[in-house]
Amino acid sequence: MNDAVKLNSIFTKLSKKKKPKLLGRGIGCGKGKTSGRGHKGQKARSGVSINGFEGGQQSIYTRLPKRGFKPIRKNLYSIFNVGDVQCLMEAKKIVKDSIIDKELLHKLGFIRSVKSKIKLLNKGKLREKFVFHVDFASEAAKRSVASVGGSVEILS
């Protein structure tokens, strides 16, 4: 039998793991008195820290200009390609002539929620006929689906 060290034979006992040094237990212990915080000053005090403070130098977020904004009601949608449908059919997760809608895409893990919006794009090649129920679709995707006999229904 081979006497080589194997991953399943290596183990460490809990007592062998190094414990962190206790702070503030008298000046003889090495981390006593000031407990590694130095003498006085703002950083030595408890409960005080200034986020982004760079020692008097102008901070990075005040040096850089303000740019853009984040809209509160941003219209997010998931992108779905016609080539993805062909891959799903080849993997036998969907059958030919089936309806591709939000419930099916959610079940297959393409979208997080049934409430999210879907946009159909024309990346990839579609060789089978499918019916799509999506919120948005590019003109090229509509032509691609129609060329194989399928249809795209835009949900309102």
Swiss-Prot record:
Binds to the 23S rRNA. Part of the 50S ribosomal subunit. It comes from the Bacteria. The gene is rplO. Belongs to the universal ribosomal protein uL15 family. GO terms for biological process: translation. GO terms for molecular function: rRNA binding; structural constituent of ribosome. The keyword Ribosomal protein applies. It holds the Pfam family Ribosomal_L27A. GO terms for cellular component: cytosolic large ribosomal subunit. This is Large ribosomal subunit protein uL15. Residues 25-48 are annotated as: Disordered. Residues 34-43 have a biased composition (Basic residues). Keywords: Ribonucleoprotein, Ribosomal protein, RNA-binding, rRNA-binding.
